[in-house]
């Protein structure tokens, strides 16, 4: 079962041995909520290399690291130009994955997401492409800025930790800064930057190509990375529907 904590309309749930909870579902019917009904994310992903090779990555961290390292070495040998060729790391529904990039940057990829990245970054910049959600811990390098492209938005990173949510079905891209600093650029208007400070979230409207900034609870936004299920303003019946 799951233990639950409701704070200010936000629910945090963690898996621990507990008796079942009885909750009100749709139509006022009561139902028992068991741990087997809510599953944490598993470590699993598929790595599709730039040359079409498909590598399944699972819970074996040593095997995963070896596979990614071997791919990186091969990529360096094959690519003698400064034009990066991208690999695609994809997580399925219910899957999560952590990867360390060539520069030491760590990325935690949430479920149903894809990170496109090169084996070796260009000499003047580091750039990745995100679909879905990921938490970034970027290695500081003033000479090679780090960029994240996501659905019409470009984030320039100055050595920091932040979370980006950019699922296809979402009307907006959500960029939340945990520490450090980032600057957002909207596609087609690269001269205007929107800077974030820790604890603030930029909401980029995909349709309107406009953005605004608001304060958020970063524990809520990044709860998924710590194995927490976070639901805002929903009762348990709605969550299980």
Residue ranges of predicted features:
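A residue-level detector for the "anchor" residue at the start of short, highly conserved motifs
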Residues: 4, 8-241
């Amino acid at each position: 079962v799951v233990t639950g904590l409701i704070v200010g309309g936000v629910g945090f749930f963690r898996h621990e041995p507990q008796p079942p909870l009885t909750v009100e579902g749709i139509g006022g019917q009561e139902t028992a909520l068991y741990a087997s009904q809510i599953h944490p994310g598993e470590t699993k992903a598929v790595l599709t290399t730039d040359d079409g090779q498909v590598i399944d990555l699972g819970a074996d961290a040593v095997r995963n690291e070896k596979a990614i390292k071997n791919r990186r070495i091969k990529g360096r040998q094959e690519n003698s130009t400064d034009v990066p060729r991208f690999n695609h790391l994809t997580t399925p529904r219910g899957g999560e994955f952590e990867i360390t990039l060539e520069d030491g940057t760590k990325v935690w990829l949430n479920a149903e997401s894809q990170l496109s990245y090169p084996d070796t970054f260009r000499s003047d910049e580091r750039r990745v492409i995100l679909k879905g959600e990921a938490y970034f811990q970027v290695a500081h390098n003033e000479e090679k800025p780090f960029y994240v492209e996501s659905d019409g938005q470009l984030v320039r990173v100055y050595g920091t930790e932040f979370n980006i949510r950019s699922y296809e079905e979402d009307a907006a891209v959500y960029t939340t800064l945990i520490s450090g600093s980032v600057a957002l650029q909207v596609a087609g208007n690269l001269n205007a930057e929107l800077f974030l400070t820790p604890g603030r979230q930029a909401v980029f409207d995909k349709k309107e190509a406009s953005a605004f900034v608001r304060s958020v609870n970063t524990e809520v936004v990044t709860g998924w990375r710590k194995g927490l299920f976070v639901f805002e303003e929903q009762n348990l019946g709605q969550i299980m529907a």
